[in-house]
């Protein structure tokens, strides 16, 4: 009798719980979510990405958007996501409702690599984030600061040109691995600009950075099921990402301490600041730390995360775009010849190019724009996250939804671009479209509050190397390869780099100076 009473009470309690949930659910207003493909338990929409048979996520998402529209709802495991594939929707999200979508989507791996979101690239929108970004914009990445690194860029590019001239003199049809050379160039420029010198720990840092970049390329089980402790335990990528970040953090802390010690020694000797590092990012941050008075104190931790953002961002974007540009020029000999003619006419026989020589090279700038259109380095931009439930184009976007803007798809859409799959720099002639974040059919660096703060630095790191390679060398494909046979597939992930290494043969046209 007593057992039956307990059973009845349990069943009654269960009935009340179920009924209350049903009533609560019925009383909740139904959300008008964007259209999207049908989902499966647990995995959500992931099977649709597999069914498109494209290894690149941005291509798979374009195929799905062509069926479901320019604003599309997906479920990446338990994570709600919206994919934007038109300029109008992008403008609504990134401009008109920018503040509502000002947070960053963090995967388990990016959270570990980028200091738990305490940096500028992936940090959530907050007072702290705003002050850190202000330091970047007003102290580290101003036009004057970027110009102050002109000598660094010119020296490192001249070094690369001399190395390639030596390769050209050695002959051979196998070609030079430009991925390695250009990556080294970018890393040397950013290291000198960041810490004032080549840095004895450079290789250790870059090795750890390369490992970290590989980990954030693909989704791990912890990214799909962030609420699951078990998924976090079994996921390998976040652990590898954390280990890599700790290695990089240790290197940066060593550099900071070495620089502090050097400045103290210089001060004790009455020498003032060492000229080599006078304008580097680290010296600027150490000055701010010493002066104080900033809304967010510039601690060593702040210096670490800001230097990490500077180095990791600049070491990836510029070489990726430069490799794509050279690959497109090799596939399009007419455009290559036109770009070379412009540079050679402007520089007129000098043995070394400076940035002052290339200010007026309009076609070179169009070539870079066209590369950024056809091969945006971040094809899905850096994803945003909805901070509060919002409405976009009549659809409800719940708080916490991740928002991906498929800039790769928008830049190849025939509704916004004539002959979108063709490489035509002339499309930007007498055209006001630029990459400053106001033309929503062309946002290679993003838009709004989260636009890339390093646009000026990134473009400066592109123009001089490209002009120098076009000026000093003619180029041919290895082993008699025809231009149309050059592989142009891209990688998947946050950055869409050229999948196959670019090997081409330099032929010296104007010999560089020897020193």
From Swiss-Prot:
The chain crosses the membrane at residues 5-25. It holds the Pfam family p450. It comes from the Eukaryota. Keywords: Heme, Iron, Membrane, Metal-binding, Monooxygenase, NADP, Oxidoreductase, Transmembrane, Transmembrane helix. One of its GO terms (molecular function) is oxidoreductase activity. It catalyses: ent-isokaurene + 2 reduced [NADPH--hemoprotein reductase] + 2 O2 = ent-isokaurene-2beta,3beta-diol + 2 oxidized [NADPH--hemoprotein reductase] + 2 H2O + 2 H(+). One of its GO terms (cellular component) is membrane. Its EC number is 1.14.14.76. It is a single-pass membrane protein. One of its GO terms (biological process) is diterpenoid biosynthetic process. Heme binds at residue 452. Its cofactor is heme. Gene3D superfamilies: Cytochrome P450. It is found in: Membrane. Signal peptide: none annotated. InterPro entries: Cyt_P450, Cyt_P450_CS, Cyt_P450_E_grp-I, Cyt_P450_sf. CDD domains: CYP71-like (cd11072). Enzyme of the diterpenoid metabolism involved in the biosynthesis of antibacterial oryzalides such as phytocassane. Belongs to the cytochrome P450 family. This is Ent-isokaurene C2/C3-hydroxylase.
């Amino acid at each position: 009798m007593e057992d039956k009473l307990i059973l009845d009470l349990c069943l009654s309690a269960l009935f009340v719980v179920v009924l209350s949930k049903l009533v609560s659910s019925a009383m909740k207003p139904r959300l008008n979510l964007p259209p999207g493909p049908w989902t499966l338990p647990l995995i959500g929409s992931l099977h649709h990405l597999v069914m498109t048979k494209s290894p690149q996520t941005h291509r798979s998402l374009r195929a799905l958007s062509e069926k479901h529209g320019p604003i599309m709802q997906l479920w990446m495991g338990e994570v709600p996501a919206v994919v934007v594939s038109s300029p109008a929707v992008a403008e609504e999200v990134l401009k008109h409702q920018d503040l509502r979508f000002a947070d960053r989507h963090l995967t388990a791996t990016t959270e570990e690599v980028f200091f738990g979101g305490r940096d500028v690239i992936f940090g959530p929108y907050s007072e702290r984030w705003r002050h850190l970004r202000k330091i970047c914009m007003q102290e580290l990445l101003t036009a004057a600061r970027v110009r102050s690194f002109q000598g660094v860029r010119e020296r490192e590019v001249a070094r690369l040109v001399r190395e390639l001239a030596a390769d050209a003199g050695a002959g051979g049809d196998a070609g030079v691995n430009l991925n390695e050379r250009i990556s080294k160039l970018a890393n040397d420029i950013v290291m000198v600009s960041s810490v004032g010198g080549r840095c004895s720990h450079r290789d250790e840092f870059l090795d750890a950075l390369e490992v970290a970049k590989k980990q954030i390329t693909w989704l791990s089980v912890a990214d799909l099921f962030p609420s699951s402790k078990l998924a976090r335990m079994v996921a390998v990528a976040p652990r590898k990402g954390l280990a890599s970040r700790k290695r990089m953090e240790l290197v940066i802390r060593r550099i900071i301490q070495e620089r502090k010690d050097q400045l103290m020694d210089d001060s004790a000797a009455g020498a003032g600041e060492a000229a080599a590092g006078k304008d580097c990012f680290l010296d600027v941050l150490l000055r701010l730390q010493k002066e104080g008075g900033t809304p967010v104190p510039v601690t060593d931790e702040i210096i670490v995360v800001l230097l990490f953002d500077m180095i990791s961002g600049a070491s990836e974007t510029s070489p990726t775009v430069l490799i794509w540009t050279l690959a497109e020029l090799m596939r399009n000999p007419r455009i290559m010849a036109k770009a070379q003619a412009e540079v050679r006419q402007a520089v007129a026989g000098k043995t070394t190019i400076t940035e002052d020589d290339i200010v007026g090279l309009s076609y070179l700038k169009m070539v870079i724009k066209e590369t950024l259109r056809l091969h945006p380095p971040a094809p899905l931009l850096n994803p945003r996250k909805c901070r509060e439930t919002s409405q976009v184009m009549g659809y409800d976007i719940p708080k916490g939804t991740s928002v991906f803007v498929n800039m790769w798809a928008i830049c190849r859409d025939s509704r916004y671009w004539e002959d979108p799959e063709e490489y035509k720099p002339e499309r930007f002639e007498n055209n006001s479209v630029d990459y400053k974040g106001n033309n929503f059919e062309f946002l290679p660096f993003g838009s709004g509050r989260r636009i890339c703060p390093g646009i000026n630095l990134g473009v400066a790191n592109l123009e001089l190397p490209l002009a120098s390679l076009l000026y000093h060398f003619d180029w041919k494909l290895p082993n008699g390869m025809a231009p149309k046979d050059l592989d142009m597939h891209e990688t998947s992930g946050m950055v869409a780099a050229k999948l196959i290494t670019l090997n081409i043969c330099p032929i010296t046209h104007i010999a560089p100076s020897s020193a």
